[in-house]
């Protein structure tokens, strides 16, 4: 019988994770190892295996746990509005922008943002995302002012 560390058992109970497969236990262990770091994390795996739980584990066991946690399904946001959703926009940036709006990167400042289905983002948005990953900087739609954000990105 495989012996499971008590902290892994506690995480399974807390997050409703069922199963004792070695790969699952190893994935939880890795999530616990990266949680205290400030590294961005890419989670890979088959569709439907519960990858969305791991960003929550990483956030809850990080120094950012008191900050905002935002999960974004990138595949569910229309291409025409994705930049506004992620980066925010200024009043008058486009038809219907009657006021300025914070995007998820500004809202999650000090916390964690989980970008599910990140590969579904348009290439132009992926280029803007790269800037956030590299320097923590972004520009709202309709603005020329560079803003800083201090977030952990999990995708």
Which stretches of residues belong to each language-model region?
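Conserved ASCE P-loop NTPase core motifs with emphasis on AAA+ ATPases
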Residues: 1-22, 29
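CheY-like receiver
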Residues: 2, 6, 29, 57-60, ...
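Conserved post-Walker A coupling segment in P-loop NTPases
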Residues: 16, 29-95, 106-122
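Surface-exposed alpha-helical interface segments used for non-catalytic interactions
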Residues: 25, 56, 84, 127-131
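AAA+ P-loop ATPase catalytic core
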Residues: 31-34, 132, 136
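AAA+/SF3 P-loop NTPase mechanochemical coupling elements
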Residues: 70, 100-110, 114, 122-128, ...
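Short gly/ser/thr-rich secondary-structure transition/capping motifs
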Residues: 92-99, 134-140
């Amino acid at each position: 019988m495989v012996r499971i560390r008590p902290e892994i058992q506690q995480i399974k109970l807390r997050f409703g994770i069922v199963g004792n497969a070695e790969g699952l236990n190893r994935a939880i262990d890795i999530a616990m190892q990266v949680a205290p770091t400030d590294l961005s994390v890419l989670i890979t795996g088959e569709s439907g295996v519960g990858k969305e739980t791991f960003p929550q584990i990483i956030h809850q066991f990080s120094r950012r746990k008191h900050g905002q946690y935002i999960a974004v399904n990138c595949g569910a946001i229309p291409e025409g509005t994705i930049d506004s959703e992620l980066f925010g926009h200024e009043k008058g940036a486009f038809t219907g922008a009657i006021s300025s709006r914070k995007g998820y990167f500004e809202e999650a400042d000090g916390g964690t943002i989980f970008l599910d289905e990140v590969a579904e983002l348009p290439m132009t948005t992926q280029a803007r995302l790269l800037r956030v990953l590299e320097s923590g900087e972004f520009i709202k739609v309709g603005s020329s002012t560079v803003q800083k954000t201090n977030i952990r990105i999990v995708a």
